[in-house]
Amino acid sequence: MMDRLNCVCPDGEFLLIDKPLGWTSFDVVARIRTSYKKNGLKRKVGHCGTLDPLATGLLMLATGKKTKEISSIEILDKEYTGAIKLGVKTPSYDGETEEFDFCETSHLTSSEIHEAARQFLGKQQQKPPMFSATWHKGKRLYEHARQGKDIPERKSKDVEVFAFDITGIELPIVRFRLQVTKGTYVRSIANDFGERLGVGGYLTELRRTKIGDFSISQAETVSDILEKIVKTAEAHQANLT
């Protein structure tokens, strides 16, 4: 399955990549696109749903004719694993900004933590974080946030949480597995989870493990894909001589 998905086909393919920490989704697209061009292979390249720089895991790219199918991948449900630090908040709901509003967590019990997670299951309205790319009055929300502005009336959207499993508790860190609909901000869930427990919290680690039926176990590294592109170009050149 992995070889079929991650082959470098002339008409286009889906590339399943394990995105490294610190890379933007566009960084990955740019690296792949540049490699195609450098090796004399003309390919359109686009990603099938962004992944934050501070997250790792499954990023799907489409090339060639498969770029026409990007929208069919973007709508698929997602699965994540990660960690939340309780007893402290950040403006961005993750580690991108400074911690504030510290609070004791030693009084929290395992049953309270599991029950708080269960309360997130089902359909709900979710506000995007201020530090997000959502548009508001001609600007991205993060642009407003960096100017010190808060937009309480930012528009909520419908999301659904299918599973929110607590997989480990070592306070103040709580580890989890999450299954959600497309467009769900896991950072917002982390922040709201901390609020529900009365201590605050933010996302310290996030890894995307599934997009629909596509799994991180099928993914390859950026280096693996780049190597395949070079080999494909060499084989193509050999056929021409």
Swiss-Prot record:
Coiled-coil intervals, chain numbering: none
Record-level GO BP terms: mRNA pseudouridine synthesis; tRNA pseudouridine synthesis
Organism superkingdom: Bacteria
InterPro entries: PsdUridine_synth_cat_dom_sf, PsdUridine_synth_N, tRNA_psdUridine_synth_TruB, TruB_C
GO terms of molecular function: RNA binding; tRNA pseudouridine(55) synthase activity
Listed Pfam families: TruB_C_2, TruB_N
Annotated EC: 5.4.99.25
Catalysed reaction equations from the record: uridine(55) in tRNA = pseudouridine(55) in tRNA
Active site: 52 (nucleophile)
Keyword terms: Isomerase, tRNA processing
KW Aminoacyl-tRNA synthetase (keyword) present: no
Keyword match Transmembrane: no
Alphabetized HAMAP family for the sequence: TruB_bact
Alphabetical list of NCBIfam families matching this protein: TruB
Function per UniProt: Responsible for synthesis of pseudouridine from uracil-55 in the psi GC loop of transfer RNAs.
Family indicated by similarity: Belongs to the pseudouridine synthase TruB family. Type 1 subfamily.
Name of the molecule in the record: tRNA pseudouridine synthase B
Species: Chloroherpeton thalassium (strain ATCC 35110 / GB-78)
